[in-house]
Amino acid sequence: MASLGVNIDHIANVRQARQTVEPDPVPMALLAELGGADGITVHLREDRRHIQDRDLDLLRATVRSRLNLEMAATAEMVGIALKIQPDMVTLVPERRQEVTTEGGLDVAAQQGSLKGMVDQLQVAGIPVSLFVDPVSQQLEAAFKSGARWVELHTGAYAEACWADQSFELARLTEATARARSLGLRVNAGHGLTYQNVEAVAAIEGIEELNIGHTIVARSIAVGLKEAVREMKRLVQNPRREPLFG
């Protein structure tokens, strides 16, 4: 049974749209936990477009589940992670022009530099996950980097047309099995919604799904606690048959 990590970046997006103080993502994280979130995920971007350093400091002091820090593989971010001591760091690719993360890390091309950062964080007691596309080459490179976890990028599945979703789901299933055969633990996320999450949640071996935008969008209608509860039910009790095919 997969657990649910709730990404609260989009709450901070609303605040930053007006450059004001509300909504504050810190108390919203508490509401997400009260709704059943097993962890809180935030992405501290280099341009600070949504989550701010102040948010991260306060979240570390207040989150009672698990705090997963998504960040670019840079010296600045490694220094912040070493200071904050999140429960996990997920290294993600980052481009200033993108609206959201557009793909997985090219671990195979950056294996040398990533290994140094992975070692530095894990020696300090912080488990490291690498956000990767569901491709064997990247999984093998992730293993060689010394990371203990991968987070599979589910964007291709989430964005696929009806006819292609079964193919993308098979890729995720195969990638999960391959990662586990290497000794890696597996999370997944990106683009998952109330409509498409169950098939991914049913994949044996995926331990946690990180989901944000759809929960925050749903919360406008039903409130954050209820939106998290609804997603938690789908993640923990998925239909075993996909809605397509």
UniProtKB/Swiss-Prot annotation:
CDD domains attached to this UniProt entry: PNPsynthase
GO BP terms, alphabetized: pyridoxine biosynthetic process
Subcellular localization: Cytoplasm
Binding residues annotated for 3-amino-2-oxopropyl phosphate, in chain numbering: N7, R18, G191, G212, H213
Keywords for the protein's UniProt record, in alphabetical order: Cytoplasm, Pyridoxine biosynthesis, Transferase
Annotated GO CC locations: cytosol
Site (Transition state stabilizer): E151
Keyword Ligase: no
Main location group: cytoplasm
Annotated 1-deoxy-D-xylulose 5-phosphate binding sites: D9, H10, R45, H50, T100
Pathway(s) the chain acts in: Cofactor biosynthesis; pyridoxine 5'-phosphate biosynthesis; pyridoxine 5'-phosphate from D-erythrose 4-phosphate: step 5/5
Active-site annotation: H43, E70, H190
TM helices/strands, residue ranges: none
Catalysed transformations (reactions): 3-amino-2-oxopropyl phosphate + 1-deoxy-D-xylulose 5-phosphate = pyridoxine 5'-phosphate + phosphate + 2 H2O + H(+)
One Pfam family from the record: PdxJ
Enzyme Commission numbers on file: 2.6.99.2
Database matches in InterPro entries: Aldolase_TIM, PyrdxlP_synth_PdxJ, Pyridoxine-5'_phos_synth
GO MF annotation, one: pyridoxine 5'-phosphate synthase activity
Subunit structure: Homooctamer; tetramer of dimers.
Function according to Swiss-Prot or TrEMBL: Catalyzes the complicated ring closure reaction between the two acyclic compounds 1-deoxy-D-xylulose-5-phosphate (DXP) and 3-amino-2-oxopropyl phosphate (1-amino-acetone-3-phosphate or AAP) to form pyridoxine 5'-phosphate (PNP) and inorganic phosphate.
NCBIfam families documented for this protein: pdxJ, PRK05265.1-3, PRK05265.1-5
HAMAP family, per database record: PdxJ
Assigned protein family: Belongs to the PNP synthase family.
Descriptive protein name: Pyridoxine 5'-phosphate synthase
Species this chain originates from: Prochlorococcus marinus (strain MIT 9313)
